[in-house]
Amino acid sequence: MITQEDHTTYPLGDGIGFVNLVTTMGDDLTTVNSARVSYGGMSEELTERDEKLIKYLAENKHTSPFRHAFMTFQVKAPEFVARQWYKHIVGASFTAPGDAISHGWNEISGRYVEYEPEFYTPKVLREQAESSKQASKESNTGLMRTAGTLLYCYTKESYNQYQKLLDMGVAKEQARMVLPFNTYTEFYWTASLQAVAHFCALRDHEHAQHEIREYAKALDEYASETFPVSFQYLKENL
């Protein structure tokens, strides 16, 4: 369980990548009252009747009331995870560390800052699945262990080349071109409750990549703690 005192999780277990719940706006009553405003109604406390209304809204795809509650996350993830995440910007807002903006995608810029030597290295490399172009399967073969060594060596060498380019005076915006896709990046994500539910439904799925699934699970736990009724019915009906 996540509490107010413990609002940071480390999805990949490497002590580098994280999801931090920065702030939230609204609660389950936000969904209820935004729906009832059509009739001039308002609830002060969440009742069983209100929960039935939330269930009805979700089951019948009346989704606009779920867009009035928001969550803001600070995320540190490998580039390949962030690029998948980018596809979910519809109905959400992204901003780099600092003041939030109302829309768009912003993250730490390699044009302005020098990248730290922070890279995601999986504990186990997976083999390509024969049944699907986008699926993978676990492997503990010697071949995969050799591939892991290759990945580690390439990552280390790419950062060395990055540093050499910077030392030669090459601009950061161009020197970064040698960095691999497992380089860590950082961004803020502000999203409606509906957008968070949609992200979790698609990315915490058996066909999704393992790494982004772990991030989706972290978001799921935060949303379930903050919006227990609304988020549960949204997930059941997406």
Residue map of PLM features:
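Family-specific signature for flavin-dependent thymidylate synthase
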Residues: 1-238
